[in-house]
Amino acid sequence: KKIKVNNTLNFLSNCSNLVRKASKIKAIAITGSSGKTSLKELLSQCLNKIASTSYSKKSFNNKFGVPISLFNIQKNNIFGVFEVGMDKKGEINHLTKLIMPDLGVITNISYAHIKNFKNLYEIALAKSEMINNIISGGSIVLNKDDKFFNFLKNKSLKKKLKVISFSEKNNADIRMIKITRKKSNYLLILKISNNVKKFIIKESLKFYIVNILATIAVISNYTDVQSLKENFFY
């Protein structure tokens, strides 16, 4: 049966938001200038080991992709991981209103989307639109190695969000201490709050340490990371 509507995109967006409102998932929205898709893939795989997880397919991160991803939410899903992209100011605001994230992640701020912006500050401002749409009492995961960390942190604290930081080199909630070779794999040693945690990772993940740190930061919002097995990422 065909339904005639005045605006297909608005109809798609409104219906997808109804699906989201009807669900009880913990929605996680990921944005940033780079690393969104690879983080989304790793995070969704890891969360799925904890509980049923819905996630954006491929790079479904625009005004069409996000609504389609929301339509894929199933009744048994506990988590939902959604990638959010942008080409212009206001786009992240629109998409995260649909997602209604329980937790947001901003990977980094760089010149990846400079064509419609004058400078990095304008990009950071556009990315920070997510902060306004994280649910009351929600959380945000931020990269402490990014030059806009304090800017994003301060905006988040004004909204009374819980800020979870991660870093490869600076003191943070989730911090890499060191990574060493262990036979054909690698031993990754992290400092999580005041505790040390070790993970065995495949060689292929050695180049995605930032994604591992961000993933652990997200998971720490929902469960005790110390309970994860050493081979959790294997």
Where in the sequence are the language-model features?
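Conserved beta-strand termini and adjacent loop/short-helix elements that scaffold enzyme active sites
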Residues: V5, S56, N143-K144, F166-K169, ...
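Adenine nucleotide phosphate-binding catalytic loops in nucleotide-utilizing enzymes
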Residues: L120-A124, L157, L161-Y234
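Phosphate-binding loop of NTP-binding sites
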Residues: L9-K144, F148-K159, A217-S220
